[in-house]
Amino acid sequence: LKWEAHTEFVTYTIFLNNLSEKPFDGICFDAFPKDWLESLSSLRITSVNLRLETMSDQENSSEIISKKLANWFVPESLAVSKVLDGSAVVASDFRIDEVGHQRFVLFVDPLTDERRVGRIIQRLCEIEMYKSMSMLGFARVRSMARQMGNIDTELSHIMSDMNDGKVAAEVTLDNLLKVSTELETLSAAASFRLGATEAYEAIVHQRIRVLREERFKGRQTFSEFMMRRYDPAMRTVKSSRVRLGNLADRAIRAGDLLRTRVDVERSAQNQALLTSMDKRADLQLRLQKTVEGLSVVAISYYAVSLVSYLLYPLAENYSVTEGFLTSIITLPVVGLVYLMIRRIRSKML
């Protein structure tokens, strides 16, 4: 029994020396205690039933292998390859059989080194293991597709409202915040899974490359199977990741445009306020000048009266009438009052 711990999962590999009479009957999995299997709280991602056969010169012929493969696998999805310079033949249809396992078979030449056989087995298990883990990302993006579509539509509506200018900036900002929050939540939830999927995909293709596949009897190779069945799913994951990033960029641009719109509106409001303040200041200045003029008249009136009262007794000695005296002192008094008020105002400023 071999146990391996990975970042997200663990693997259990059991090796049995004797081949069962009925290929892929799943009896080897009975070696795992049922109560132990039932006690596992984790989800089983994949299960591989790999059969290893060492062929004699006669049995290792292409016809015998082809006959066995036809009996063990579904022909429509069967992938077969000679690997590592023809030292072995690997095959699988990548389908789950009736007992819940994926079937792999490895035919090896009797002269093939045990270490090389072990490496081939390790690569085959890793191909299926990392393929299954990467498909978790495909399941995630399928569940995200509708939500991303809704966010895309909402962003389009927000941009349309901003273009029309009929919706208040506060309403647009509230809608944009809701969409941005939903988008950020979605991105945070999917970021790790999409990144892990990309890493797992790279491992799958790397493991297939190191097998150095050669075509067997015109059948599709593992790399060709992956290109037809696996790569489209991974391209969907990549395109969804790019789409998610584009949605985030659109939300950022929408926020920038809204900020620009608010700044322009605020600038226009400030300009209007400054214009209003200028008009008000001009009005206050004119009113101040009017009040100043009235103040000069009022003060001058009382000043002339006081000066007349003071000078009239003296003016009688010279036979000067009160009216003539008033007319003489009015202009000088008014001038003095005006100069006095101007001086007071200049000191206040």
Regions found by a protein language model. Name each.
Residues L1-N18:
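Ser/Thr/Asn(+Pro)-rich, low-complexity disordered segments
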Residues D282-L349:
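Alpha-helical transmembrane anchor segments
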Residues T46, L84, T112-D113, H157, ...:
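Cytosol-facing regions at membranes
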Residues F15-L177, T181:
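Extended alpha-helical interaction modules
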Residues K2, S20, C28-F32, L285, ...:
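Phosphate/adenylate-binding glycine loop and adjacent helical scaffold
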